[in-house]
Amino acid sequence: DRRQYTLLRKQFDDRPIASHQLVQEKLAWMITEITKGQLLAIQCGRLKDQGKLEPAHVSMLKKNNVEIALEVARKSRDLLGGNGIMEEYPIMRHLCNLETVKTYEGTDHIHTLVI
């Protein structure tokens, strides 16, 4: 949704906001962080398969991926502008869900202590 929106939304001399470097940087950051989180999850899966997964690994995974998911959702909301808080786009629901996940999966403070 966010990428498509940035391609369609026009601003400043009737150019899509996706053509602006600040928007491109946010999109690049988001996909990079999402990919890093996926790689971390894959590595933890491999460690589990090998019987080498430790609680600290799980805490690193949860702490990192929940924080990144929250930041990606916030940046996505920013890219959507005023529409980011409208029901038409589900980003606010995702943000609320992620805040819940941050709590029930253990706060980052608890995970830091485990690590």
Predicted segments — roles?
Residues D1-I115:
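Alpha-helical interface subdomain recognition
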